[in-house]
Amino acid sequence: MDFTTFHNIIGGKPRGSDNSHSGVDPLTRTTLWPVPTASPQDVDDAVEAAQRALPAWSQASYDERTGLLEKFADLYLSRAGDFCQLLASECGRTVENAAIEVYWAAQWLRYPSSYKLPEEQIEDDTKTAIVTYEPLGVVAAICPWNSIGKIAPALATGNCVILKPSPFTPYTSLKLVELAQEVFPPSVIQVLSGGNGLGPALVKHPGIQKISFTGSTATGKQILKDGADTMKRITLETAGNNPAIILPDIDVTATVPHISGGLWFNAGQVCIAPRRLYIHADIFDVFVDALVETTKEATKEMTKIGPVQNELQFRKLVKTLDDAKSAGHDMATGGPLADAETGGFFLRPTIIKDASPESSIVSGEHFGPIVTCVRFSDADEAVHLANAGESGLAASIWTTNLTAAKALASRLDVGSVYINGPPQPDPRVPFGGHKQSGLGVEYGLQGLLSFCQTKAVYLYK
């Protein structure tokens, strides 16, 4: 398979287009390979092909489908080196960092094999009711780079999938689906790359039963509106302005490196990365000083932290930092721009000290290497600050007192809480956001069932 030419995959076959677009390597700002731009006819053709493939695929047994996912995981890992290089090019990561995601993705392909779709029976003197879970039909997955987390459960439960990657990061998804044609029947999994009109075309299409989306809250709300006319089933994973609560009993020297790694990995472009640090007043100054020193050391190798993925987001973050500087915020480290000589879309990791909890730099989600530090005096205040705002994706708590940590976790209005460890989803555990950070869950058994519809059959005696 050639990793320098790219096609949409429709009906099991590569398809070009009269129009094309290209991504940009954020490490060097160089233009990458051309990618065909899907047309409205391509959308219709992909949906029709998926509908033709659906009867046979949905009737295959769960074990048959997950067996093919296992086979695909093996095939994918056999090309891991190529995918690491490709992911590094389109996301600006080091190959070592890209490898983390590539091997993570293989585990996501395998996780449905550890489950069975349940069949429930409810019986009384007059009847037996049998509850089963069936495929929804054709699913469109719209996401930037975590597509396997959507593909695996959708295929395992008997749906056909049309993947729509971000126009900024289309390459890995296109090659992933091209490789999948060696394993799955034609049209079971397809991929379309395109511009701003492609997502709405999929959401509004009457032949698609479900949308699974990862991205901004604003786009998620628009998907809900666009999908209303056809009563789409919709799962959303949207913005996360995630809090971390740091209690005074921690060992600062031992804890700061663990927190720092979660802050700056992939330049903070991780949906569950901490963005608001709530630090107990008793250790605030010593903690921030240690975090600043650790961060300064990390910025000596900016390529390991990585660039912002695209110029649009880069410019937004630059403006955010310019505004923060103009507002007089105390930037303990970092600042508006890294040295121009880096060439890529690099920003220095920025720690903003003693920010007002009500300020936009704290309340807004900044998808990049920006972290705010706020003091708190007791648990009630920490919970109040952490729960402020409309996001509720994830939170983390750092303490030696697990009883206190569990009590705090129960009061946080978020979908996932990580105690004394880095925010990192597990494919066996349901993942979803509270408030405006999402709708529904993915992963685990609940995630599998989110790609199903329920049927009850009554047998009268």
UniProtKB/Swiss-Prot annotation:
Positions annotated as active site in the UniProt record: 237, 271
Chain residues that bind NAD(+): 215-220
Name of protein: Aldehyde dehydrogenase LUC3
Disruption phenotype annotation: Abolishes the production of lucilactaene and NG-391, and leads to the accumulation of prelucilactaene G and prelucilactaene H.
Function: Aldehyde dehydrogenase; part of the gene cluster that mediates the biosynthesis of the mycotoxin lucilactaene and the lucilactaene-related compound NG-391 that act as cell cycle inhibitors with potent growth inhibitory activity against malarial parasites, moderate growth inhibitory activity against cancer cells, and no activity against bacteria and fungi.
Pathway involvement of the protein, from the record: Mycotoxin biosynthesis
UniProt record similarity statement: Belongs to the aldehyde dehydrogenase family.
Species whose genome carries this gene: Fusarium sp
